[in-house]
Amino acid sequence: MVDMTQLQAIYGGTFDPVHYGHLKPVEILANQIGLSKVIIMPNNVPPHRPQPEATSAQRVHMLKLAIADKPLFTLDERELRRDTPSWTAQTLQEWRQEQGPRKPLAFIIGQDSLLTFPTWHNYETILDNVHLIVCRRPGYPLTMAQEADQRWLDRHLTHDVESLHNSPSGVIYLAETPWFDISATIIRQRLERGESCAEMLPAAVLDYIREQGLYC
């Protein structure tokens, strides 16, 4: 029997720094599909991306400031305690073991990440442990480069919210979330040039960035 009352999701990323483009779409998503909790999980050594500019401790502090008044979010630092790359499949398998076999669990990604998903380490095991919730990105198609990958997507894709609650894992749900044209790269560039980005991230996070002399 599936526990239908507590759909939870992990939201991973570098968060260098965390900004409204991270937080607002997920808050809207939670209301749309009935997420009870979103676990923010900062990466330590992202296998596919350059090293973060802020330290792990600084990124964690910024996240704590950003979600201090947002009960939807909690923070999980397990990947920061590893000395190895942050493999999503490993983390999600651990999470499933902790939560038991019946609880509906999900992993939130962007549509851009879905297109490269088959290149992820042990990607084929991920849907054994969680659902995938895909947030739309402008300009990205819903077609995979390889025919076999397209068949995999078509087999698991659903537009039925209830399927996220009625089974513990195994579906890919395409969410209708709004797009916020904000990125950590843009914020870092604007800060480096001494330009304002107050509308892009929480005030407490921006104050901390200035106190620490980050991204300048």
UniProtKB/Swiss-Prot annotation:
GO biological process, one term: NAD biosynthetic process
EC number: 2.7.7.18
Keywords: ATP-binding, NAD, Nucleotide-binding, Nucleotidyltransferase, Pyridine nucleotide biosynthesis, Transferase
Catalytic reaction equation(s): nicotinate beta-D-ribonucleotide + ATP + H(+) = deamido-NAD(+) + diphosphate
Record pathway: Cofactor biosynthesis; NAD(+) biosynthesis; deamido-NAD(+) from nicotinate D-ribonucleotide: step 1/1
Pfam family, one: CTP_transf_like
Enzyme class: transferase
GO MF annotation terms: ATP binding; nicotinate-nucleotide adenylyltransferase activity
Disulfide bonds: none
Transmembrane intervals: none
Similarity comment: Belongs to the NadD family.
HAMAP family cross-referenced by the UniProt entry: NaMN_adenylyltr
PANTHER family the record matches: NICOTINATE-NUCLEOTIDE ADENYLYLTRANSFERASE-RELATED, PHOSPHOPANTETHEINE ADENYLYLTRANSFERASE
Functional note: Catalyzes the reversible adenylation of nicotinate mononucleotide (NaMN) to nicotinic acid adenine dinucleotide (NaAD).
Record-given protein name: Probable nicotinate-nucleotide adenylyltransferase
Origin species: Klebsiella pneumoniae subsp. pneumoniae (strain ATCC 700721 / MGH 78578)
The encoding gene: nadD
